[in-house]
Amino acid sequence: LCVGMHRTNQFTECDGMLGNNSNLVPGAAGDTSGSLYPRRGIKNIIMADGPAGLRLQPVFKTDKQGNLLPGGEMIGGYPAAFNSSYTNENSDTYYQYCTSIPIGWSLAQSWSPELLESVGTLIGREMAAFGVDLWLAPALNIHRNPLCGRNFEYYSEDPLISGKCAAAITRGVQSCSGKGVTIKHFAANSQEDNRYFSNSH
């Protein structure tokens, strides 16, 4: 887990920090600082959320200098409108439509590790195409409580099936050079009481 605060006296630029949206890949969950690249050769890491494939902003615009323009962000399930002053003459429009894959428990019902591995490979290739380094998935929690609002993300109530599914999709993603997963929600994410004041990360 990367946490921290940018110090202006230590670095010469202020890139996105974990928890903010990425300015490098619109709609990505966040990115780490690229400030160490000039001195140490350490690239920043761009992370995109799951769980049904990559979750990125499908449409975005930049000005002619390449600066991201506001609009297109998902707000309340709908994309925010672009300012009508953005025309083809003063802005460029980009599209990054990602494949929507079935959710975890649907994939687990296939009983096919080969299928899950091929789905992982598809996700890894899309990560490469859109410049994403880490996929914030798969979700490996088990179905402990039928009232859990996030059971759809998890593979099964059976830990063996869940582990086999997560391993297969991980193999697929990581078969693509430089791409990785962040298996998450090992425990306590199924708690519905006091949900907004607990931390399962």
Pin down the residues of each PLM region.
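Glycoside hydrolase catalytic-domain context in secreted enzymes
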Residues: 1-201
